[in-house]
Swiss-Prot record:
InterPro entries: G_ENGB_dom, GTP-bd, GTP-bd_ribosome_bio_YsxC, P-loop_NTPase
Cofactor(s) annotated in UniProt: Mg(2+)
Function: Necessary for normal cell division and for the maintenance of normal septation.
Protein name: Probable GTP-binding protein EngB
Originating species: Salmonella newport (strain SL254)
Gene: engB
Protein residues bound to Mg(2+): S40, T62
Length: 210
């Protein structure tokens, strides 16, 4: 398994929907979450870059699909934040259509990272994202963000509760606690990304040997 250097990740482009994304090849891992789940902070912590993904004081600002390239053919995809109360209903529906379309149709999508505030996990839209991914045979990593906001005992209890709850999806769903502030869970995130980005390697090796 290749250990990628996520510090060299760079911004490629923004797209309003799946039709405006670059060609559907290589490997993509998508990041999704409610508008205040700490998605941008997690991407910045992962890549050790302060402003790779812009963090906004106004949740719901990320309305585009943002693509970042780790190395050629291996991309991180920052999906629009969902479920924020102050966003107009029509815009919410548009985002949800874009998210669903991306998860169902994007062939290069290898894994989905769903970020949830550890204090408020598994809201309706979080569950819908996981359900969509499982139905499309996409592996999921759930990051319970802002883990530093809870004491150790409460953190473990939330982690165990969510791990128990996701069993109902009958899919490949891993759950970890994460804190951008304390850098907790970053190694687990990198390990999962490395495994997803290595997924195509065995096939290529077989072809080379023929």
């Amino acid at each position: 398994m290749t250990n990628l250097n996520y510090q060299q990740t760079h911004f490629v482009m923004s797209a309003p929907d799946i039709r405006h994304l670059p060609s559907d090849c290589g490997i993509e891992v998508a990041f999704a979450g409610r508008s205040n789940a700490g998605k941008s902070s997690a991407l910045n912590t992962l890549t050790n870059q302060k402003s790779l993904a812009r963090t906004s004081k106004t949740p719901g600002r990320t309305q585009l699909i943002n693509l970042f390239e780790v190395v050629e053919g291996k991309r991180l995809v920052d999906l629009p934040g969902y479920g924020y109360a102050e966003v107009p209903e029509e815009m919410k529906r548009k985002w949800q259509r874009a998210l669903g379309e991306y998860l169902e149709k994007r062939q290069s999508l290898q894994g989905l990272v769903v970020l949830m505030d550890i204090r408020h996990p598994l809201k309706d839209l979080d569950q819908q994202m996981i359900q969509w991914a499982v139905e499309s045979n996409i592996q999921v990593l759930v990051l319970l963000t802002k883990a530093d906001k809870l004491a150790s005992g409460a953190r473990k209890a939330q982690l165990n509760m969510v791990r128990e709850a996701v069993l109902a999806f009958n899919g490949d769903v891993q759950v970890e606690a994460f804190s951008s502030l304390k850098k907790q869970g970053v190694d687990k995130l990198r390990q999962k990304l490395d495994s997803w980005f290595s997924e195509l390697a065995p096939v290529e090796e077989i072809q080379d040997g023929e």
